[in-house]
Amino acid sequence: TDKDGALDELFKIKEEGLAKAVGLAMGRIDIMFPILKNWDFDVIINHNRYTLLNREADEMYSYAHSKNISIFNAAPYAGGVLAKGPSNFKKITYQDASEEKLAPAREIERVCKKYNVEMGAAALQFSMKDKRITSTICGVTSVQSIEKNLAWAKTDIPEEFWNEVLKLPFSTKDPESERVYTAG
């Protein structure tokens, strides 16, 4: 981010017509948002910070949208728990989660069961229905998971469901703040 650094060079490449767009991709909002405010990016990708469980990226997404920056929201399933359900998958954003940390996901699961809505459909459409978000990026591991994502994207979800699920509490803290990274 220094003058004459990598970002300067990327924007020069765009000015010279060698690239059509310059984007910024990262997880940590505390690093990403200040960079975003100081450069004229065309697109951003952020992951795990705008889900049914977490809205840490909300302010940054509003800012980016106001600047006509395309927003790609990745990992709408919070690392899998919102696709598989907290009864089957006891991790949030790739980390083992205590019962206390799983409680908000269990509340979402409860509302999903009440309205007969699959959690994955709710999580995916939460991102897809946000007008600020240009596209939602989902990790897939097989043809079956692609088919499931496509089905979830087309699922009819009643407005009553959204009215209830959007009233549930959510975090605005970095969901990976306690994540331990190991080499290899």
Predicted features, each with a name:
Residues 1-167, 171-172, 178-184:
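Beta/alpha (TIM)-barrel catalytic core signal, keyed to glycine-rich beta->alpha loops juxtaposed to Asp/Glu
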